[in-house]
């Protein structure tokens, strides 16, 4: 212990006791560390012994498991050898069975072929019987479906027609009420104007007095009277687009009030000045108020404007009185009253209502949607003597609006001839849309070729076929459920050829009904007023509803093959064949 001094002994100047004390402390420290090391090594040995015992136990367990698995491997090897032997034996047996079954199948196929050859005659007889039965069933089902479809379409068409008729009648009554209100307001305005004219006439002197200028047509003419000022031509000559002038002249009185013209105060004034002044008047009521007959038998009278029927005699048109508009005083001129504004508002309302009426009329079903109905008053007048109270409506709508027949730029004429040609119509002139309500004829600006009907669609496809007639939804896009009977024929099951249903020898009555129904499509339907006689070019016997014809001669109207060919080649002459009652 003394031979191995510590690494850091005390210094040379230390005493022996200090050196000895330091060595003792070092010895004690090393002794304690040695005791701790012995304790820890003992614990480590115990843990290592435990680990060794545990490893030995695991080794014994793994050896036992390996022996067990070896026994299992030997068992599976034995089972595999046995299963392989059994599989080879079963495979040989199955191959023998397959060979036997193939021979049996070949024998059975030969027998089945012989049986099929023997059974062909019976199947042929059964097919003939089944085809005959199915042919009769298809014909019967087609007839039933056609009848049901036609009845349903007729019901739907009648309901739609009744609803639209009620709607159009209601709108027509509203138009009539507004017309009466406008007439009352115009009567009030006329009375006020006559009162104003009488007031002015009291202030005017004799025609030769110096109140008037010697040359009224000169542009610089002025009045010598301090109360009267003569308007110049530059002021009176308004443009064509002017609707109202500063002189609030009333319109002419209605047809029932036609009497002697108003007293001409200044009858010797030039006609040019009279024309320039009369151009700025409100629209006269001689044409646009009440419907005028074109040409009738000359044995009737002209009814009052409140009457619902106008079957008057010869065409009586009132020529508006050429009132001389004398120079007026600026102090006596009427201000812009509320009545003019109210009249303009009423006329605008009437135009809107007429537009609604035309929109409703455009939604009316055509003749293919509503069967033609024979009117009890259709043959009273011919098509050439059609009364002017009938509005001819075409599906093409080429004539424009019937609310205001002439553009608003046209001035109101002061001289209208009192007689018109027999086949023409009376144009209803108005100023800038300020027109009276009228159920008169539409202006047919073209010849009779414009109003001829288009060629029938049914004449090209149903001239020789008795297939189901096209429904009203066929040309107008309304979806319908597709029935088993299609538009061209019946689908025969089992792939057989179609029977003689579409090409049998029935009479042409069905085709003629279809052609008549399509012929009415291009004609002008005339929703006449209550009590107005309708005009029809030809006679339609019976109810006019297309019904299936029998094999024999039917009592309905027939269309020959030449008529069908003419309907295909081009439009025929004008024929107003569907002018039914609309009330």
UniProtKB/Swiss-Prot annotation:
Pfam families noted in UniProt: NUDE_C
Bias (Basic and acidic residues): 35-67
Cellular component annotations (GO), alphabetically ordered: cytoplasm; kinesin complex; kinetochore; microtubule
UniProt keywords, alphabetically: Coiled coil, Cytoplasm, Cytoskeleton, Microtubule, Transport
Subcellular location, record wording: Cytoplasm, Cytoskeleton
GO BP: any one term: microtubule nucleation
InterPro entries, A to Z: NUDE, NUDE_dom
Principal subcellular localisation of the protein: cytoplasm
Residues in coiled coil: 14-195
Single Gene Ontology MF annotation: microtubule binding
Source domain of life: Eukaryota
Gene3D superfamilies: 6.10.250.1080
Biased composition (Low complexity): 453-469
UniProt-annotated stretches for the region Disordered: 34-68, 211-339, 358-583
Compositional bias per record (Polar residues), positions renumbered to this chain: 219-235, 279-319, 329-339, 379-392, 399-422, 529-538
Keyword Cytoplasm on entry: yes
Function: Required for nuclear migration.
Subunit (UniProt): Self-associates. Interacts with PAC1.
UniProt-listed PANTHER family: NUCLEAR DISTRIBUTION PROTEIN NUDE HOMOLOG, NUCLEAR DISTRIBUTION PROTEIN NUDE HOMOLOG 1
Family statement: Belongs to the nudE family.
Name of the featured protein: Nuclear distribution protein nudE homolog 1
């Amino acid at each position: 212990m003394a031979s191995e001094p510590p690494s850091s002994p005390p210094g040379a100047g230390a005493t022996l006791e200090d050196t000895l004390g330091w060595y003792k402390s070092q010895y004690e420290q090393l002794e304690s560390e040695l005791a701790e090391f012995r304790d820890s090594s003992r614990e480590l040995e115990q843990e290592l012994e435990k680990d060794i015992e545990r490893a030995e136990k695991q080794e014994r367990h793994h050896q036992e498991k390996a022996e067990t698995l070896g026994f299992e491997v030997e068992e599976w090897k034995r089972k595999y050898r046995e299963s392989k032997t059994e599989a080879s034996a079963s495979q040989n047996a199955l191959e023998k069975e397959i060979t036997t079954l193939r021979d049996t199948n070949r024998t059975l196929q030969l027998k089945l072929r012989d049986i099929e050859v023997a059974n062909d005659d019976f199947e042929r007889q059964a097919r003939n019987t089944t085809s005959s039965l199915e042919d009769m069933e298809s014909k019967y089902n087609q007839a039933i479906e056609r009848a049901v479809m036609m009845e349903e379409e007729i019901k739907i068409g009648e309901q739609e027609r009744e609803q639209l008729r009620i709607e159009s009648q209601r709108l027509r009554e509203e138009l009539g009420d507004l017309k009466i209100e406008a007439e009352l307001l115009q009567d009030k305005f006329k009375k006020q104007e006559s009162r104003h004219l009488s007031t002015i006439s009291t202030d005017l002197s004799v025609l030769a007095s110096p109140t008037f200028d010697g040359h009224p047509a000169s542009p610089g003419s002025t009045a010598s009277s301090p109360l009267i000022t003569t308007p110049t031509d530059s002021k009176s000559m308004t443009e064509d687009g002017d609707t109202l002038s500063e002189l609030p002249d009333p319109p002419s009185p209605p047809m029932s009030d036609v009497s002697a013209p108003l007293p001409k105060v200044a009858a010797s004034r030039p006609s040019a000045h009279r024309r320039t002044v009369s151009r700025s008047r409100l629209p006269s009521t001689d044409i646009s108020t009440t419907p005028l007959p074109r040409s009738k038998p000359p044995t009737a009278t002209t009814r009052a404007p409140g009457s619902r029927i106008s079957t008057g005699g010869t065409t009586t048109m009132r020529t508006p009185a050429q009132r001389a508009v004398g120079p007026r005083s600026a102090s006596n001129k009427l201000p812009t009253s509320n009545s003019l504004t109210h009249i303009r508002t009423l006329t605008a309302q009437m135009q809107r209502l007429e537009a609604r009426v035309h929109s409703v009329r455009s939604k009316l079903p055509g003749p293919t949607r509503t069967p033609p109905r024979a009117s009890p008053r259709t043959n009273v007048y011919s098509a050439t003597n059609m009364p002017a109270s009938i509005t001819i409506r075409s599906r093409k709508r080429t004539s424009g609006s019937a609310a205001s027949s002439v553009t608003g730029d046209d001035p109101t004429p002061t001289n209208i001839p009192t007689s018109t040609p027999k086949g023409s119509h009376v144009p209803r002139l108005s100023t800038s849309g300020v027109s009276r309500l009228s159920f008169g004829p539409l202006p047919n600006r073209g010849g009779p070729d414009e109003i001829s009907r288009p060629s029938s669609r049914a004449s090209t496809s149903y001239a020789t076929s008795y297939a189901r007639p096209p429904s009203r939804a066929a040309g107008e896009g309304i979806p319908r459920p597709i029935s088993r009977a299609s538009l061209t024929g019946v689908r025969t099951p089992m792939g057989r050829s179609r029977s003689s249903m579409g090409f049998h020898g029935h009479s042409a009555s069905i085709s003629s009904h279809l052609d008549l129904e399509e012929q009415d499509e291009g004609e002008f339907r005339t929703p006449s007023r209550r009590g107005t006689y309708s005009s029809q070019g030809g006679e339609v016997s019976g109810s006019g509803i297309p019904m299936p014809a029998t094999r024999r001669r039917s009592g309905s109207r027939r269309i020959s093959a030449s008529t069908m060919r003419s309907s295909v080649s081009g439009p025929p002459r004008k024929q107003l064949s569907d002018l039914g009652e609309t009330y």
